[in-house]
Amino acid sequence: MKVRASVKRMCRNCKVIRRNGVVRVICSDARHKQRQKGGK
């Protein structure tokens, strides 16, 4: 899980979603998982 100020899609399988006010990227490639720093 990468924690970044700016989350971006790294491939076409990546999906940007919002869970409990936190922006996340989920993907079939585990290396592409990201979470946005800061939260609320």
From Swiss-Prot:
Keyword vocabulary terms for this entry: Ribonucleoprotein, Ribosomal protein
Say which domain of life the source belongs to: Bacteria
Under the cellular component aspect of Gene Ontology, which terms does the record hold?
cytoplasm; ribonucleoprotein complex; ribosome
What InterPro entries does UniProt report for this protein, alphabetically?
Ribosomal_bL36, Ribosomal_bL36_sp
Q: Biological process (GO) annotations? A: translation
Q: Name one GO molecular function term.
A: structural constituent of ribosome
Q: Pfam families under this entry?
A: Ribosomal_L36
Task: Say which family it is in.
Answer: Belongs to the bacterial ribosomal protein bL36 family.
Give the HAMAP family listed for this entry.
Answer: Ribosomal_bL36
For this entry, the protein name equals Large ribosomal subunit protein bL36
